[in-house]
Amino acid sequence: MLRVDRIDVSYGEVQILREVSFDIEDKEIVSLLGSNGAGKTTTVNSVSGILPVMTGSIFFMEENITNAAPYSRVALGLVQIPEGRRIFPSLTVMENLEMGSYLKGAKSVRKESLRFVMSLFPILETRKTQLAGTLSGGEQQMLAIGRGLMSKPMLLILDEPSLGLAPIVVSEIFEVVQRINKEGVTVLLVEQNISQALSISSRGFVLEEGCIALSGKGVELLGDPHIKTLYLGL
């Protein structure tokens, strides 16, 4: 479904990514892992078209999207939910969700998408007329995921969905990610919560200093001595 082939990305004169390559198959959950500053967000921002690629290529559904605009990638079914949620605080919950279905294809199935989102997050049904900025952090993350799902993604990119949330909410978010995947949506999960991310992922890729340092099946990476020592403190 997605193939990232040896991309280099820079901020000004500072090179952040060096020959980063990875792939995602249809209906997988794949984790992109690493410490702060490793290049995780830079990688997914390049995949979604927010950052330009200096060299290398990005393919989605066999189509070269390296130079495609972000909105074109969304129209193809590649949707990113950025770190920090970035909801519209002065709009209601329902208005935020409707903003996610602005493209023609998503708009035509808005009611169906809305039912699915409300089945995942029943709390949003009770909050639908409430201003999004008054929601709790966990509810805002649910809204951000829901808004992304309203775009009818084929590939959903989640950038640090558990960041700053209470443990009980984190568990709920990871359960929802699995439910979304079971409905046929492929997921790229960017996380610092490595143990939980790998436990639900078929495969994982570990970024260190802008390069892919490790890759493998989720269960294998959980048992890797390097992962245990550097990231899990074992």
Cite the ranges covered by each PLM segment:
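Conserved structural motif at the start of ABC-family nucleotide-binding domains
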Residues: L2-V4, L17
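ABC-type ATPase nucleotide-binding domains, specifically the catalytic core motifs of the NBD
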Residues: G12, P52, V93-E112, L120-P122, ...
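The feature captures the beta-strand-to-loop junction immediately N-terminal to the Walker
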Residues: L33-S35
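Helix-to-loop junction immediately C-terminal to a conserved catalytic motif
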Residues: S48
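ABC ATPase NBD coupling module
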Residues: P52, N64-G84, K107-L114, T126-T129, ...
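Conserved ABC ATPase signature
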Residues: L131-L135, E139
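ABC ATPase C-loop
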Residues: G148-L149
